[in-house]
UniProtKB/Swiss-Prot annotation:
This is Chromosome segregation in meiosis protein 3. The gene is csm-3. Component of the fork protection complex (FPC) consisting of tof-1 and csm-3. It is found in: Nucleus. Pfam families: Swi3. Residues 31-40, 288-301 have a biased composition (Polar residues). Residues 230-246, 400-409 have a biased composition (Low complexity). Residues 20-51, 150-367, 388-409 are annotated as: Disordered. Forms a fork protection complex (FPC) with tof-1 and which is required for chromosome segregation during meiosis and DNA damage repair. FPC coordinates leading and lagging strand synthesis and moves with the replication fork. FPC stabilizes replication forks in a configuration that is recognized by replication checkpoint sensors. Keywords: Cell cycle, DNA damage, DNA repair, DNA replication inhibitor, Meiosis, Nucleus. Belongs to the CSM3 family. Its main location: nucleus. One of its GO terms (cellular component) is replication fork protection complex.
């Protein structure tokens, strides 16, 4: 019995050991179990296949990943320009003498920022995209806002902006500060204007009443016809004590229109021109010789003298208005003729003096001028003596009044 048990164990071991060798043998005959399984598999494969046409097909689109762009929204994000503004303080530039290293440091700073913001593009392409996006309205407004934040401003303006943002009503504005000197000036009371000459008078102290502008005559203005007639009459009737000396020297002492001397333009040959000769002749006719002292045809020249003459001058007999007008007309006609003749002769003498060299021109003109002035004085003297006639005392009072009016001019 024990021998049979050993044979059974040995055969079982051999069968188990050689069980796997038949699978690898291509020439072995198939076992009945494996043949049945192969038949079932072949039947399944031979079933007609319709390629899924009869079945419903569900078409599902895959969701696309959003494409990242470097636009204005990305530049305004936290990784964009706000981050660049925060980290700008870390950039240190050395300045003069280190331009190349500073430029390299600046470019590397921007490159690191763009690599973090938009890593898909190169540095040059990212800069071009930033420039293109910078022309949009949103970035323009943001840039203006950043510039305004960098400007200095007062604390009151900042407080008002904070209140507006929070929606609180703004308190009353603080009064503007002012220097003490201006505070004193504004706090002082206004004084009433006063007049220097008339403090308590009835004049308008505030100058509110409109007044008529009074024309002021310039010193060189020409008097009107009435004043000229009055001055000519007084000049013809009066005599100057130093007229003869002035005429001998070739120049008049005083003008009938004032105390100013005539401005003459000097010439190389010291020969007076036509205008100077005319002026000298007109002044010469207004004077009489110093040997005879006659008073004014209107009296002694004082309104309150009562008809009494000065002791130094004897009052000549007065004449009426018609004789005075005739005398004035005749004197003016003679003066105009003398002036024209003198002008012609002076111009002819100037031409001859220029041709001869101007040696004796000055002496020649002075002698001729003295002759004309002497003739004019003699004519004035004889005319005044011939027309002089006695007159009543009532006419003297009228003459004195006329003389006072002339002094008023």
């Amino acid at each position: 019995m024990p021998a049979q048990d050993n044979d059974n164990n040995t055969s079982a071991f051999v069968n188990e050991f050689l069980a796997g060798w038949d699978d690898d043998d291509p020439f072995r005959s198939p076992s009945p179990e494996t043949a049945g399984t192969n038949k079932t598999n072949n039947k399944k494969r031979k079933e007609p296949d319709t390629l899924g046409i009869d079945k419903e097909i569900d078409v599902t689109k895959k969701a696309r990943v959003p494409r990242v762009k470097l636009d204005d929204a990305r530049l305004l994000s936290d990784k964009g320009i706000p981050k660049l503004r925060k980290t700008a303080s870390k950039l240190k530039l050395k300045g003069k003498g280190h331009e190349f290293s500073d430029a390299a440091r600046l470019l590397s700073f921007y490159q690191e920022w763009l690599d973090d913001l938009f890593p898909k593009a190169t540095f040059v392409d990212a800069l071009a995209m930033c420039e293109k996006a910078g022309h949009k309205t949103t970035l323009r407004n943001a840039r203006l806002k950043w510039i305004a934040e960098g400007k200095p401003r007062s604390t009151t303006a900042e407080e008002e902006e904070d209140r507006d943002r929070e929606g609180q009503p703004s308190a009353s504005a603080e009064p503007t500060r002012m220097a003490p000197i201006f505070e004193k000036a504004t706090g002082a009371k206004s004084k009433t204007p006063t007049l220097d000459n008339n403090l308590f008078g009835d004049d308008d102290i505030y100058n509110a009443t409109p007044r008529r502008n009074q024309p002021t005559a310039a010193p060189g203005d020409i008097p009107d016809d009435d004043e000229l007639d009055a001055l000519m009459a007084e000049a013809e009737s009066g005599a100057a004590p130093g007229a003869s000396k002035a005429t001998n020297n070739g120049a008049a002492s005083d003008s009938i229109f004032g105390g100013g001397a005539i401005n003459r333009r000097p010439r190389p040959s010291e020969v007076p021109d036509d205008d100077d000769l005319d002026a000298l002749m007109a002044e010469a006719e207004s004077y009489r010789p110093s040997t005879t002292n006659h008073g004014s045809i209107f009296g002694n020249g004082s309104a309150s003298g009562g008809g009494k003459d000065k002791p130094a001058m004897a009052a000549p007999p007065q004449e009426d208005d018609d004789d005075l007008d005739a005398l004035m007309a005749e004197a003016e006609m003679h003066a105009s003729l003398a002036t024209k003749t003198t002008g012609k002769e002076s111009t002819s003498r100037e031409r001859t003096s220029e041709q001869d060299g101007g040696k004796d021109a000055q002496n020649y003109d002075e002698d001729d001028l003295d002759a004309w002035m002497a003739e004019a004085e003699a004519y004035t003297k004889t005319t005044s003596i011939q027309v002089a006639q006695p007159k009543d005392t009532d006419d003297d009072w009228e003459a004195e009044a006329a003389m006072a009016e002339m002094h008023g001019f």
